[in-house]
């Protein structure tokens, strides 16, 4: 695991319960430890959330992106781990 991956997540925006947020941060950190490619990290997080919390999760991981999304109430978090931004949300 690189030093960048050891960074504490920094939440920039959220509409989510603390329990769900902590679970998403843990799943994301684990995926970051396991994979190098952003699409693999995003895919792993999405699949785990779909299994654990039901379908229609969306996960975007990268260093430079814009977004404008609609999400299910209580199911949105935007955070950084090291240099990577994570946008995670669920739609109905």
UniProtKB/Swiss-Prot annotation:
Self-association and partners: Homodimer. Cytoplasmic dynein consists of two catalytic heavy chains (HCs) and a number of non-catalytic subunits which present intermediate chains (ICs), light intermediate chains (LICs) and light chains (LCs). Component of the nuclear pore complex (NPC). NPC constitutes the exclusive means of nucleocytoplasmic transport. NPCs allow the passive diffusion of ions and small molecules and the active, nuclear transport receptor-mediated bidirectional transport of macromolecules such as proteins, RNAs, ribonucleoparticles (RNPs), and ribosomal subunits across the nuclear envelope.
GO molecular function: dynein intermediate chain binding
Reported function: Acts as one of several non-catalytic accessory components of the cytoplasmic dynein complex that are thought to be involved in linking dynein to cargos and to adapter proteins that regulate dynein function. Cytoplasmic dynein 1 acts as a motor for the intracellular retrograde motility of vesicles and organelles along microtubules. May play a role in changing or maintaining the spatial distribution of cytoskeletal structures. Also a component of the nuclear pore complex where it may contribute to the stable association of the Nup82 subcomplex with the NPC.
Record's keyword terms, sorted: Cytoplasm, Cytoskeleton, Dynein, Microtubule, Motor protein, mRNA transport, Nuclear pore complex, Nucleus, Protein transport, Translocation, Transport
Coiled coil: none
Species whose genome carries this gene: Saccharomyces cerevisiae (strain ATCC 204508 / S288c)
SMART domains in the cross-refs: Dynein_light
Gene Ontology terms describing biological process: establishment of mitotic spindle localization; establishment of mitotic spindle orientation; mRNA transport; nuclear migration along microtubule; nuclear pore complex assembly; nucleocytoplasmic transport; protein transport
Chief location category: cytoplasm
Entry's localization field: Cytoplasm, Cytoskeleton; Nucleus, Nuclear pore complex
Protein name: Dynein light chain 1, cytoplasmic
PROSITE patterns per record: DYNEIN_LIGHT_1
Superkingdom of source: Eukaryota
Example of a GO cellular component annotation carried by this entry: cytoplasmic microtubule
UniProt cross-references to CDD domains, sorted A to Z: DLC-like_DYNLL1_DYNLL2
Pfam families: Dynein_light
Claim: Aminoacyl-tRNA synthetase is one of the keywords in the record: no
Misc: Present with 1310 molecules/cell in log phase SD medium.
SUPFAM superfamilies noted in UniProt: DLC (SSF54648)
Family, per entry: Belongs to the dynein light chain family.
């Amino acid at each position: 695991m690189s030093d960048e991956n050891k960074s504490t997540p920094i939440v920039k925006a959220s509409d989510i319960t603390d329990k769900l947020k902590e679970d998403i941060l843990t799943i994301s950190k684990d995926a970051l430890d396991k994979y190098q490619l952003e699409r693999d990290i995003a895919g792993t997080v999405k699949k785990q959330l779909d299994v654990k919390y039901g379908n229609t999760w969306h996960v975007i991981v990268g260093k430079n992106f814009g977004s404008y999304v609609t999400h299910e109430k209580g199911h949105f978090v935007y955070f950084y781990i090291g240099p990577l931004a994570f946008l995670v949300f669920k739609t109905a």
